[in-house]
């Protein structure tokens, strides 16, 4: 894998994209199971998620960079990660509140509770160690796909294979860019998997 491809993969599967990807996945394979079959409603959901979890946080990060609160938008250092992680967690909780207030979106709102838990977990770890949030988010996504496939009896197995292949590519890309050590990548993935597994287990 070349450096440019590793950079592209890292941007394409940046953790900030993950809530939007999860919503697209729900729209594609699980709409009827969540009693939301209207495409216009799904477009509203995607718009809210895009604004709350991607657009506004990115603009705030850019402002922090301009104000020299953080040194880099890549959040390479542990110091740079504190405020962005806290902001992301708050916006995830805000998105949860918006969706949870509408009855048919209650199931969807759990995604953002889980996302907030993961972010604050990463924030706590960041005080003493730099963990790969790319790997953590891919571990969370892998477990979520397995959960959906098992609980909602999804016949297609390709999403399961695909997410594990993508997880491997993302992890390798982070190592290729020397953004993390192998232990930071592996433990990030394991922690993402464990947190989501425990969360889903409490729902059963």
Question: Language-model segments: which ranges?
Answer:
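Transmembrane alpha-helical segments of multi-pass membrane transport proteins and ion-pumping complexes
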Residues: 15, 19-20, 53-62, 89-96, ...
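C-terminal halves and exits of single transmembrane alpha-helices
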Residues: 83-103, 125-127, 131
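The first (N-terminal) embedded transmembrane alpha-helix
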Residues: 10-30
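Juxtamembrane helix-capping/reentrant segments at transmembrane boundaries
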Residues: 9, 71-87
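Membrane-interface helix termini and inter-helical loops of multi-pass transporters
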Residues: 30-40, 69-73, 101-104, 204
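Alpha-helical transmembrane segments
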Residues: 40-55, 114
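Membrane-embedded catalytic cores of phosphoryl/pyrophosphoryl-handling enzymes
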Residues: 105-204
